[in-house]
Amino acid sequence: MRFLKIIVVILFLSSCSTEEDEIILKLDEYDLEVISYFKEIALGFEFGSSSKITRKWCSDLKVYIGGESNSILNEELDKIITEISSLTTDNFNIEVVSDSSLSNYYIFFGSGDDYAELFPNSASYVQSNWGLFSLWYNSSNCLNRGHMYVDTYRTNITQAKHLLREEFTQSLGLARDSDKYLNSIFQSSWTETLSYTDLDKDLIRLLYHPKMSTGLD
């Protein structure tokens, strides 16, 4: 019931101009923390001029893994996908496909230069970023394609695993960073976090709850 309550409040606040203290539903401190962090992380993107509204995948996410073969990172991706799938309740599905033509999301393991050859629009970012993601969305604010990379030359395996989790999770539509919580996967400063905090999990649950729609601010 907690998440349904939070969803109702978010929907209320997004469509109502009255004062927040008129809300009848009582929220505890953690509920308010989740809502505040959700608004900070889920509205808009870190770069560009896109409006600060909710966006998420409205169809299945079909992942193709390219670049250099890396069994350790492949296994880590499987683990991350399993974790995400356990948190979503709106029929969102993630699968890894072996044919890039069937995919709508490309994960590249290798060097930044090789990634930039495949995706030239990312060329200006790879020198200063060991991990990177890009997303596109349609007129309904549903994410519909994207790509990311993990630089396996400038990172050790722990760092590479962290970047894979961070960039892939942000590609769900939780696309902004924050300096608020040190252990969060969305922490803006460099960390080597390899797991989600309870708060991180709740953000995924909220965005991929059946009551959460795109286009909310």
Which ranges hold each PLM region?
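Sec-dependent signal peptide recognition
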Residues: R2-V9
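Metalloprotease/metallohydrolase-associated module, dominated by Zn2+-dependent proteases
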Residues: E20-L32, F47-G48, S124-Q159, A175-D217
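Generic detector of well-ordered alpha-helical segments enriched in charged/polar residues
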Residues: I35-L43, D78, Y106, D200-Y208
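N-terminal hydrophobic targeting signals that begin at the initiator methionine
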Residues: M1-R2, S17
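Metzincin-family zinc-dependent endopeptidase catalytic domain
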Residues: S71-Y181
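Residue-level signal for mature regions of secreted extracellular proteins and peptides
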Residues: V9-I10, S50
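C-terminal motif of bacterial Sec signal peptides marking the signal peptidase cleavage site
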Residues: F12-S15
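Disordered inhibitory propeptide/activation segment of secreted metzincin zinc metalloprotease zymogens
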Residues: S17-S71, F133-S140
